[in-house]
A protein has these predicted regions:
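Alpha-helical hydrophobic helix detector
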Residues: 2-14
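Extended, hydrophobic alpha-helical segments in both membrane/secreted and soluble proteins
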Residues: 12-15, 19, 31
Length: 297
């Protein structure tokens, strides 16, 4: 009898696990839909899409960078987070301890192993945060689609995405998305931080990665699309753009076979990890005039 029960459990367990992951993936999709709707709320109010980073200069002359996660907070019923943030100080300073540790459910994918609040370490100097600085912050499993460097134009420039992140850059307008809202990614999964993961959701270690301005509520949280090697160890080392590395430059989700993206029309798609890098480039760029076919996806 015990042996029979053990066999039944072994047969049922995969089905139970699959059902649980389906529920988690559904919530992850819903999170991206809410973020996409918040982006349109921002667009309706401000006339442009949200910037990927907000830049302020303090009386000390220090340039501070804050994330789209703060810019969209009021449109996600998270005004308390926005109001608690002191934009005159960087995300790692004590003045922003309270705000940086406010965990926002919609920014966390339940399939991700990221804790609600995690310990981060800066891996190089940026925006007043020095290498080795340690701080605690709420984690974020989604990133803005900023640009693609997989295919450069004749001048060697990257293709612009819909969420501008260049310091001092201009935010994109509705009219600037000439490739079509349903063909252009706004946000995507980049889950698992601050731990660095490679293929098959295996933790890896690469010196200098990830830059921990990504993955937490006060950081940049954007993707400049570039191909990774299929072992997840080399940037610009191949054509893997889904689930090879979560240190920036590609999508990364903890769902079997792929990751989710939000499109500018508010819809969400699941992209397979076998997707071609050139197809991802088309989806990231907002005004390159590329043609997407059903076969591409």
């Amino acid at each position: 009898m015990i042996a029979i029960i053990a066999v039944l459990v072994s047969l049922l367990l995969p089905a139970v696990q699959a059902a649980r992951e389906a529920a988690r993936r559904s919530q992850c999709v819903n999170n991206l839909k809410q973020i996409g709707l918040a982006l349109h709320g921002y667009l309706d109010t401000n006339g442009t899409f949200c910037l990927g980073q907000f830049v302020t200069t303090t009386p000390r002359g220090q340039v501070n960078i804050s994330s789209w996660t703060l810019g969209l907070a009021p449109y996600l019923e998270q005004k308390a987070l926005f109001d608690s943030w002191n934009f005159g100080f960087n995300f790692a300073e004590p003045k922003n301890t309270t705000g940086s540790q406010i965990a926002v459910g919609v920014y966390h994918c339940p399939s991700s192993p990221s804790p609600a609040v995690a310990d981060f370490t800066a891996t190089y100097d940026m925006a007043g945060v020095t290498t080795g600085s340690k701080f605690r912050s709420a984690s974020v499993d989604y990133a803005a689609s900023a640009n693609s460097t997989i295919i450069l134009d004749s001048a060697g420039a990257a293709a612009h995405g819909v969420i501008s992140y260049t310091v001092g850059g201009n935010p994109a307008t509705f009219a600037a998305v000439t490739d079509g809202l349903s063909n252009t990614i706004s946000f995507l999964e980049m889950a698992g931080g601050p731990t660095l993961y490679g293929p098959k959701r295996t933790p890896i270690n690469i010196a200098g990665l990830p830059w921990t301005a990504m993955g937490h509520v006060g950081g940049i949280n954007r993707i400049s699309l570039r191909g990774w090697s299929y072992d997840g160890l080399v940037q610009y080392g191949g054509n893997c753009v889904v689930n090879c590395n979560n240190g920036g430059g590609s999508l990364y989700g903890f769902h079997p076979g792929g990751a989710n993206v939000a499109l500018c029309d508010g819809s969400v798609r699941f992209l397979k990890q076998t997707i071609a890098a050139t197809t991802m480039h088309k989806l990231v760029s907002r005004a390159q005039g590329e043609i997407l076919s059903a076969d591409d996806l």
